[in-house]
Amino acid sequence: MDVQHPPGVSSGTGDPGPSAPALLTWAAMAASKTAPGRKPGPAADPDQRVELLRAAAMLLAQEGPGALTVRRIATEAGYSTMGVYSRFGGKDGIVEALFVEGFHGLGEAMTGVPETDDPLTDMLGCGRAYRRFALDHPTSYAVMFERVVPGYEPTESAQIMAHGTFELLVGRVRRAMELGALPVADALETAQRIWAACHGWVSLEIHGLIKIDDPDGAAFERSMVALCGPIELSAPPPRATRASAPRSTRRRG
C-alpha cells in the first residue's frame, strides 16, 4: 500500500526491520492495517490500543491532521468512538501516544549505537541513527518535532520522556570530554549545538531542501565530523584586536 504523506512531509525509504518497536513506523502500520469497519470480537480487545494508534497514524499520513477526528479514527480501526475515549480520553491522548512512542523509537535507535574506544565515532553513529530514524519515519518525526496536529501540546510527562532522549546525546558528549576526544566544556550546551545542527540538516532533507545528492548521508556525516572535530564548540570565536587588524596599503590622495 502506498502511503501519501501530508504536504511538506516526504516519504521514508528504509525498512525498520522486525526488531523495530510497534507503532513507530508508518510503513509498518500501513502494511498491517486492518480493513475499515472490522468488528473485533472479545479476543481482539487486547489489540484495541494498537489498532486505534495504527488508524490514527494512517489517517495522519494519508490525509493530514484535518482527518484526525475521534470518529474517523474509530471507524478506520473498526471500534466505537467510546473505545477511543476509554483508551485515550480523546484525540489529544492518541496524538500524545504517537508522540511518546516516536521518542521511544528514536531513543532505541540511539542506544543501539555501541560504545567503543572512539567516542567521536560513537557520536557520529548516534547522528547517523537520528537521521535514519527521521528519514524512515517522517510522519512520526513531524508529530515529535513539528507540531503538525493543531492544538496539541505535549504534557509535562511526555516532554520529560522526550528530554530523556536528548540526555542520551548529553551522555555521549560527556564521555567524549572525559576521554579527551572533545575539549572540556559545558556538555549540555555542546550537546544542544550538535543536536541543533543534526536536526536542522535532517529537517531540511525531509522537506527536500538539501540541494545536493546525498543518498548515503556522506555530506551529512562530513557536516557532523566538522562539528565534532577539534573545535571547542562552547568557546566563542576570537575577537580581532586593533593591533592584529590588517593595514590598508592604498595611498590617500
Where are the model-predicted features located?
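N-terminal intrinsically disordered/low-complexity leader segments
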Residues: 1-47, 58, 235-253
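Short secondary-structure transition hinges
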Residues: 132, 136-171, 206, 210-213
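Helix-turn-helix
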Residues: 51, 59-93, 97
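Amphipathic C-terminal alpha-helical segment
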Residues: 133, 171, 175, 195-213, ...
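Amphipathic alpha-helical linker/stalk segments
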Residues: 100-125, 154-163, 174
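Amphipathic alpha-helical packing segments from all-alpha helical-bundle domains
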Residues: 154-179, 188-192, 218-221, 225-229
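Hydrophobic alpha-helical connector segments
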Residues: 111-140, 162, 190-194, 240-244
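Generic hydrophobic, amphipathic alpha-helix propensity
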Residues: 48-57, 73, 98-102, 106, ...
